[in-house]
Structures are given as structure tokens and as C-alpha cells.
Curated annotation (Swiss-Prot):
HAMAP family: Cyt_deam. GO terms for molecular function: cytidine deaminase activity; identical protein binding; zinc ion binding. This is Cytidine deaminase. It comes from the Bacteria. Homodimer. The active site is at E110 (proton donor). The gene is cdd. It comes from Actinobacillus pleuropneumoniae serotype 5b (strain L20).
């Protein structure tokens, strides 16, 4: 499994290759915040003043650093993304692949950045900045957002394009009469039980987004003394849905904690028409060498 040391080496190489003051400043700040790949609105404003650039120009300059977080043992193809929240915060994302598992377990960079922002408490994404044109899977995933109609996509070669330009005549949650969509506040009530890690899994399951299957699902990881959670984000097209273990592993990686050992994994699911138990158990065993503790609530 790639280590934090490998991430640091990649970033150092990018800094040397780019020889760009923005890249250097971003890398320095990442090191100061222990490689937690989220930047406050205040930090973003400071850089915009310092380098006399817009939010989008700043995010475009950040892409080579964001791509350093990629985990790509299969493709060796590094994709970096920056989701800009309506709060003004920047959230990095990167693609992640898992050996010895079905390729459907892959995390796309746009999914990574969006899930990162969602778990961090962001309320909407205004802009998605990415170093390669979004694939159809990601275009459909972004169409689930509460900001889908106004979301702008920015690439190194083309900026200020609305999502609908990449996904004309789209199919989405409104076609299935879903009013509260991804990033809208969800209100579900699940009974708490068990120890703190189990309770965390239940609480994060209650915050998941599953309007089609009604199968709420959450994961809690014991990472040293910290609990890191991930939750399910469903999609109107079903296949682009984002699974809770990927969500948790992604958040751990982007929090700069990929070196910290995971000692336990708890999954909580409500009884619905689907289950992510088997896929999550397979990934937990092959990628982490751990048994997944499962509860139905």
C-alpha cells in the first residue's frame, strides 16, 4: 500500500518539475497541515491576493499536487481534481484503484473530491476543476448534485463550461421525482447501539443518500485514536453510486492518514432492497487484511 512517504516524494518531484510559486506555496501549506488536502476559504483568499489570480486559476495550478494523491496500481494514470465549495473552500480529489478487486471498486477523481467535500460538511459545489475531461461515469455522478444545473467544469484547456454541456439531455434525480438530492440535508433516524465505533457507523449511515434503494449505509474506521467515517451516495443511474468503504478510505487518504493503521472496520446498513456488504467485505480483506464487522439497523 502506498505510504505517506511516497506521497511526499511525489509532491517534492512536482514542486521541482513545475518550479511554480503557487505549486510551491500549496505544497508548503500541505506539509504544515500534515497533508490534509482541504484548504480553508481564508487560505484560498490569501493565495488569490498573493498570486493575483482567480479561484479557478488557483485550482488549475493545484491540479498537479492533487494528482499526487492518486493510487493507480492498475492504470498508472494520475487524475487530480479540485472541488470548489460555495463556502470558498478547496477540496482535493484523486483517482484510486485497488488490486485484486473488480474494477468497479475504483474511485474516480471527481467522486473523490465530491465525497471529500460532502464528508467535510460542505453544502454545495460550485466548480469542479480537473486535469482530464470527465468521463461519462463522472458526468452522471455530478448530475446528482444539488448544484448540477449551475456547476461549472474547468479543464487546463477549457474553462467555464456548464455540466449540462458535457451531459446534454441528461437523466437525473428529477426524472425519478427526487426533490432532496446529494448535498441537500438528509434526515434519517436510525437507533444507536454498540460501542463508539459502531455508533459512528450508524450515525454516518443515517446521513447517507439513498433515495432510490432506501438502503442507508455507512462505514466507520478505527484509525489510531481517530474514527474516520464514509457514507453511501446513490445515483439515479445506479452504477455511478459511491460506496461507503471507498468514501471512508478516500477521506482517510485525503486527510493525510494513509500511514496510520486501521484496526477495525464497522459497517451499518438499514434493511433495504440492496446491500453493499459483500463488496465491502471483499475490499476490506484484500486491501486492508481486515474482517468487516457488520450490523443491520
Amino acid at each position: 500500500m502506498p505510504t505517506l512517504f511516497a506521497l511526499k516524494e511525489r509532491i517534492a518531484q512536482v514542486v521541482q518539475e513545475k518550479n511554480d510559486p503557487i505549486v510551491t506555496a500549496v505544497a508548503t501549506t500541505l506539509a504544515e497541515q500534515q497533508y490534509n488536502a482541504c484548504f480553508s476559504a481564508e487560505q484560498v483568499k490569501l493565495w488569490k491576493r498573493q498570486f493575483k489570480c482567480s479561484s479557478v486559476e488557483l485550482a488549475l495550478a493545484c491540479l498537479p499536487i492533487a494528482a499526487c494523491y492518486a493510487l493507480v496500481p492498475i492504470s498508472n494514470f494520475y487524475v487530480g481534481a479540485v472541488a470548489i465549495g460555495e463556502s470558498g473552500r478547496f477540496y482535493f480529489g484523486a483517482n484510486q484503484e485497488f488490486n485484486a478487486q473488480a474494477i468497479q471498486q475504483t474511485v474516480h477523481a471527481e467522486q473523490s473530491a465530491i465525497s471529500h467535500a460532502w464528508l467535510a460538511g460542505e453544502t454545495a459545489i460550485t466548480d469542479m476543476v480537473v486535469n482530464y475531461t470527465p468521463c461519462g461515469h463522472c458526468r452522471q455522478f455530478m448530475n446528482e448534485l444539488n448544484s448540477a444545473k449551475t456547476l461549472k467544469i474547468h479543464l487546463p484547456h477549457s474553462q467555464n463550461n456548464l455540466l449540462r454541456q458535457y451531459l446534454p439531455d441528461s437523466f437525473g434525480p428529477k426524472d425519478l421525482n427526487i426533490e432532496k438530492v446529494l448535498f441537500d440535508q438528509q434526515t434519517h433516524s436510525l437507533p444507536l447501539r454498540g460501542d463508539l465505533l459502531t455508533q459512528a457507523a450508524i450515525q454516518t449511515a443515517a446521513q447517507s443518500y439513498a433515495p432510490y434503494s432506501k438502503s442507508l449505509s455507512g462505514i466507520a474506521l478505527q484509525v489510531g485514536e481517530q474514527i474516520i467515517c464514509g457514507r453511501y451516495a446513490e445515483n439515479a443511474a445506479f452504477n455511478p453510486s459511491f460506496l461507503p468503504l471507498q468514501s471512508a478510505l478516500n477521506y482517510r487518504r485525503l486527510s493525510g492518514k494513509s500511514d496510520e493503521r486501521i484496526s477495525r472496520i464497522v459497517m451499518a446498513e438499514s434493511k433495504g432492497t440492496t446491500s453493499h456488504r459483500q463488496m465491502s467485505e471483499a475490499l476490506a480483506e484484500s486491501f486492508l487484511g481486515l474482517n468487516l464487522e457488520y450490523i443491520e439497523v
